[in-house]
């Protein structure tokens, strides 16, 4: 009888083509997502070697990082480098027979939102993309992670990847989430607990009552930020919530094939007694809405808390880095989080740009107005999310409140397009990274949930969403 295995063990074992004595494996890749930033050199390598894309039907190309989100984006991209990358992806996709969603296609959007909504992402698969937040797809019980440009070329040419197996980590979130606390708060709390290096060398499986109660959108938010916790990937075992989400998607199995697939997917869970190298537990019932205060995703505190004092940190190097973060953020220890005013609000990204996120934000702002000191924007994660939101009338709620209603793309998550912070501007953002300069040169980022960001836009400062009227 074989030893109990984790979910990660099972998917890994199913995809090993060959294994060397030192543990290096050749892993088969089921799905490859491609965007314009990390693919040009990879496709150029194929051109120079005269190689085809081995499995174009298992590859999907989407433009997302560089595209403008302004309503007039059809007029073209002003930045020359960005325009060249977008044009190169369109040309390469055509040359190699890869399906491509341009900015003119309503299916276009952020690659990690597009994959799941098209049914391209399925349980038990290995999925890669030249983007660190590929971990998002792990919400379906898939082994998904980012790869470098040279690896992008390798997967395009061979449909395989050279890898060494990571260790197993279990993060169990027990109990029920209080009102006003979301998946974003869970994952920020996890990163605050383990630190940005806590998951280094591991693949994380998320489990527990609070995780099971989440929608697929919430689960994608959790897995999306696994990389911010240092992990290679994040996984959640598929269940009925997963299967219902997949049914009817354009590229998902149909009919009897779907039923056969579901029977297999039901085996994708960690066996009782399976070994985890590290286990972390959190009590969902005690979690508050969370706000980041520094320049690392581990710098988090309750919305009812205060900016911490780095002098309380024993480690000299870490203490110095936190003082630097406070200096960059323009904050002082002891400042109440609810006293921090914001200049900008960004609701979107592959972390929180889905329909559920927009519904949560709309519920907060309906009938209210954005503070006169705040510039706020909503960027749907895909054309289909935008279409659904408009069908529900959410765009009218946002526009009447004073938000900018934009076209889909990565937008202000990163300063690679026209949406960026000016030096010194402070932003409540639903994205995943608050590094120095991430949203614009000398811009200051606070990571929050969509509801918290929406409330900050109305109030002009952070507020406890649990007390929102």
Swiss-Prot record:
GO MF, one example: 4 iron, 4 sulfur cluster binding
Keyword Thylakoid included in the entry's annotation: no
Keywords: 4Fe-4S, Amino-acid biosynthesis, Branched-chain amino acid biosynthesis, Iron, Iron-sulfur, Leucine biosynthesis, Lyase, Metal-binding
The protein's enzyme class: lyase
Cofactor: [4Fe-4S] cluster
Function noted in UniProt: Catalyzes the isomerization between 2-isopropylmalate and 3-isopropylmalate, via the formation of 2-isopropylmaleate.
Key word 4Fe-4S present: yes
GO terms (BP aspect): L-leucine biosynthetic process
Protein known as: 3-isopropylmalate dehydratase large subunit
Naturally occurring in which organism (per UniProt): Brucella melitensis biotype 2 (strain ATCC 23457)
Pfam families: Aconitase (PF00330)
Family the UniProt entry places it in: Belongs to the aconitase/IPM isomerase family. LeuC type 1 subfamily.
Gene: leuC
EC number annotated for this UniProt entry: 4.2.1.33
Reaction(s) the record says it catalyses: (2R,3S)-3-isopropylmalate = (2S)-2-isopropylmalate
Pathway: Amino-acid biosynthesis; L-leucine biosynthesis; L-leucine from 3-methyl-2-oxobutanoate: step 2/4
């Amino acid at each position: 009888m074989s030893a109990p295995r984790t979910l990660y063990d099972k998917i890994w074992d199913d995809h090993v083509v060959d294994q060397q004595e030192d543990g290096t494996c050749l892993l088969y890749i089921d799905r490859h997502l491609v965007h314009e930033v990390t693919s040009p050199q990879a496709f150029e390598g194929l051109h120079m070697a005269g190689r085809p894309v081995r499995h174009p039907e298992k590859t999907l190309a989407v433009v997302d990082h560089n595209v403008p989100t302004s309503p007039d984006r059809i007029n073209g991209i002003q930045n020359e480098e960005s325009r060249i990358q977008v044009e190169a992806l369109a040309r390469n996709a055509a040359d190699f027979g890869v399906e491509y969603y341009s900015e003119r296609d309503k299916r276009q959007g952020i690659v990690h939102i597009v994959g799941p909504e098209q049914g391209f992402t399925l349980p038990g698969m290995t999925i890669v993309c030249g983007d660190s937040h590929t971990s998002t797809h792990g919400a379906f019980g898939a082994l998904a992670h980012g790869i470098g440009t040279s690896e992008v070329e390798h997967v395009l040419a061979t449909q395989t990847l050279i890898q060494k197996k990571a260790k197993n980590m279990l993060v169990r979130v027990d109990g029920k989430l209080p009102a006003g606390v979301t998946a974003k708060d869970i994952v920020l709390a996890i990163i605050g607990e383990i630190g940005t290096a806590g998951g280094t060398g591991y693949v994380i499986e998320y489990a527990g009552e609070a995780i099971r109660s989440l929608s697929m959108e919430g689960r994608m938010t959790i897995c999306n930020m696994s990389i911010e916790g240092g992990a290679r990937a994040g996984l959640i075992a598929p269940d009925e919530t997963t299967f219902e989400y997949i049914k009817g998607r354009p590229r998902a199995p149909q009919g009897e094939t779907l039923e056969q697939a579901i029977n297999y997917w039901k085996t994708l869970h960690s066996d009782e007694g399976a070994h985890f190298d590290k286990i972390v537990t959190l009590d969902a019932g005690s979690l508050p809405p969370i706000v980041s205060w520094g320049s690392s995703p581990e710098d988090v505190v309750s919305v009812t808390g205060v900016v911490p004092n780095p002098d309380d940190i024993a480690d000299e190097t870490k203490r110095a880095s936190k003082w630097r973060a406070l200096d960059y953020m323009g904050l002082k220890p002891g400042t109440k989080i609810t006293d921090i005013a914001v200049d900008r609000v960004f609701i979107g990204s592959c972390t929180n740009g889905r329909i559920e996120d927009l519904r949560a934000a709309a519920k907060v702002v309906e009938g209210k107005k954005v503070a006169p000191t705040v510039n706020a924007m909503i960027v749907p994660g895909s054309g289909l999310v935008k279409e659904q939101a408009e069908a529900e009338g959410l765009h009218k709620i946002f526009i009447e409140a004073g938000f900018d209603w934009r076209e889909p793309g990565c937008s202000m998550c990163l300063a690679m397009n026209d949406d960026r912070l000016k030096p010194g501007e402070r932003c409540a953002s639903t994205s995943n990274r608050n590094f120095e300069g991430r949203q614009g040169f000398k811009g200051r980022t606070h990571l929050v949930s969509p509801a918290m960001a929406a409330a900050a836009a109305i109030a002009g400062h952070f507020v406890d969403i649990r007390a929102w009227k």
